Design a protein with these regions (language model features):
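Flexible loop/hinge segments that line or gate small-molecule binding clefts
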Residues: 136-175, 273-284
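Hydrophobic alpha-helical segments within soluble ligand-binding/sensing domains
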Residues: 159-195, 289-308
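Flexible loop/turn connectors
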Residues: 247-323
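Extreme N-terminal segment that seeds HTH/winged-HTH DNA-binding domains in transcriptional regulators
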Residues: 1-35, 310
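Amphipathic helical "hinge" segments at domain boundaries
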Residues: 29, 64-122, 128
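N-terminal helix-turn-helix
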Residues: 24-58
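An alpha-beta-alpha
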Residues: 179-217, 311-323
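Periplasmic-binding protein-like
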Residues: 78-79, 128-136, 195-199, 237-245, ...
């Protein structure tokens, strides 16, 4: 074992034996240099590794303090998502499965709210060895994220340009949505009109989806509109509904069922972000989706080996009977 590894293990053992408890201060770097005889950079490296494991945190000008006695954990990972929607649950479960028990994953949600996002970053910064974050696509959050070292951060789901040194695994929304709508043009033309339910404040929808939809309507002469919310009981036949928000989708499907509407015949439904319910409910819902489990596997690999990754996950059309 190297000197810093010996020091790390000594502190881990001391924490495990309750010699250090949560809230206790570790000996200062200067004291450790004097008493142990190791170089200052060796002590700093050891304390920083203990930070990465989530066992200690550094307080400015005060020193290093014990914050956890979970000594079996190799690395604490902060996962910051939009909300616990079904597809993000798939991401979370896969990430945890891939990392295994030696990695502690703590999940947080920002709900597409910049103020909440800032509070979350402030609260978790410096307390985790790795950060997996689905960012709000707004320039205002860039400085917040750039306070985290590039080798400890990976952006997932949404793309935000933090610079060439930062890793990401993201979806691309505008061109992917547009090309999928073009692919579906023969099916879309079966309907008299099209409605997109889009509300970026409540369903966290990226603006690229709306832009793609508007461009598609214009380019192909399709009659269509955009609604922020669905009002129960307002279903119209011979209409294709493009629904991003799953809460709206479930209410809409309930009304369809009560009104004895046949999907793909009386009206059509196109959704976003696939899950097992959309596969089986009412004969299946046609969905535009990326593979969130694959995204999580790539993110887990980054957490474990730290090799830089900058990639866009393909978006796929999953055709079912709802069109």
């Amino acid at each position: 074992m190297s000197k810093h590894e010996i020091l790390v293990q000594s502190v881990v053992d001391a924490i495990g034996d309750n010699e250090f408890q949560v809230g206790d201060k570790l000996p200062s770097i200067n004291i450790m240099v004097r008493d142990v005889g190791y170089a200052r950079k060796t002590i700093v490296k050891a304390y920083e590794e203990l930070k990465d494991r989530g066992l200690v945190e550094s307080k400015n000008k005060q020193g290093y303090f014990v914050i956890s006695q979970e000594t079996g954990v190799v690395l604490r990972v902060a996962l910051l998502l939009f909300a616990f929607q079904s597809f993000q649950e798939d991401f979370y479960n896969t990430l945890r499965e891939e990392l295994g028990k030696k990695f502690q994953v703590d999940v947080f949600f920002h709900h597409n709210n910049i103020s909440i996002f800032e509070t979350m970053i402030t609260n978790i910064k410096g307390k985790y060895g790795m950060y997996v974050i689905a960012p709000i696509q707004d320039d205002a959050v860039k400085p917040m994220l750039q306070t985290i070292a590039p080798n400890k951060l990976i952006l997932v789901d949404r793309y935000l340009d933090l610079g060439p040194e930062y890793s990401f695994i993201a979806q691309e929304f505008e061109n992917a949505t547009y090309s999928t709508l073009v692919k579906l043009l023969p099916d879309i033309k079966k309907y008299k009109s099209m409605v997109l339910f889009f509300n970026s404040k409540t369903d966290y929808s990226p603006i690229g989806i709306r832009r793609a939809y508007e461009r598609f309507l214009k380019d192909h002469g399709i009659k269509g509109s955009i609604e922020e919310n669905y009002i129960s009981g307002t279903i119209k036949k011979d209409t294709l509904y493009f629904i991003k928000n799953d809460s709206i989708l479930w209410t809409f499907l309930k009304d369809c069922n009560q009104g004895h509407c046949v999907l793909g015949k009386d009206l059509g439904i196109l959704s976003y972000d696939d899950n097992v319910l959309k596969e089986i409910i009412m004969g299946g819902i046609t969905t535009i989706s990326t593979n969130f489990k694959e995204m999580a596997k790539i993110a887990a690999k980054y957490v474990m080996d730290g090799n830089e990754i900058r990639t866009i996950i393909p978006t796929n059309l999953i055709s079912r009977s709802s069109l």
